[in-house]
């Protein structure tokens, strides 16, 4: 079983704010392209911190159950052209498969992620947190807080 790295809402917001600060000045951006689905929350945080209201989505999907799959663009950010002046935001770059497809679609965009693993790191222009390749990231939107029974209840 791979190692796990748990991300809280507080940590995600803090890391997003640090990453956003490096994207100034805002005047260089026409808008944000949020990579669905993992990049939707980080893109919302970036849009808020940078005061950007023009947010497009890029929806990339894959098929074939749980196996490594071919990428299919379900919806492109059509107003972004070749990406010049656009900030592409995703939560994570892992092996680089999705990142390569994004680079092909928007070669002139600046591509940023909150988290980066070594195999994907060369494909992004900026990221905030380096994560080992063999580590699974548990994002806050994939987790739920639950009641923890007191230890004395185990007796």
From Swiss-Prot:
Domain of life from the UniProt record = Bacteria
Q: Which residues bind xanthine?
A: 94, 137
Instruction: Kindly tell me the pathway this chain contributes to.
Output: Purine metabolism; GMP biosynthesis via salvage pathway; GMP from guanine: step 1/1; Purine metabolism; XMP biosynthesis via salvage pathway; XMP from xanthine: step 1/1
Do you know which InterPro entries this protein is assigned to? Answer: PRibTrfase_dom, PRTase-like, Xanthine_Guanine_PRibTrfase
Q: Which reaction does it catalyse?
A: GMP + diphosphate = guanine + 5-phospho-alpha-D-ribose 1-diphosphate; XMP + diphosphate = xanthine + 5-phospho-alpha-D-ribose 1-diphosphate; IMP + diphosphate = hypoxanthine + 5-phospho-alpha-D-ribose 1-diphosphate
Q: Which Gene3D superfamilies match?
A: 3.40.50.2020
Binding positions (Mg(2+)) = 91
Question: GO cellular-component terms in the record?
Answer: cytosol; plasma membrane
* Compartments where found: Cell inner membrane
The entry's guanine-binding residues are: 94, 137
Q: What class of enzyme is it?
A: transferase
The UniProt record lists the EC number as: 2.4.2.-, 2.4.2.22
Assigned protein family? Belongs to the purine/pyrimidine phosphoribosyltransferase family. XGPT subfamily.
Q: What does this protein do?
A: Purine salvage pathway enzyme that catalyzes the transfer of the ribosyl-5-phosphate group from 5-phospho-alpha-D-ribose 1-diphosphate (PRPP) to the N9 position of the 6-oxopurines guanine and xanthine to form the corresponding ribonucleotides GMP (guanosine 5'-monophosphate) and XMP (xanthosine 5'-monophosphate), with the release of PPi. To a lesser extent, also acts on hypoxanthine.
Identify this protein by name: Xanthine-guanine phosphoribosyltransferase
What is this protein's gene name? gpt
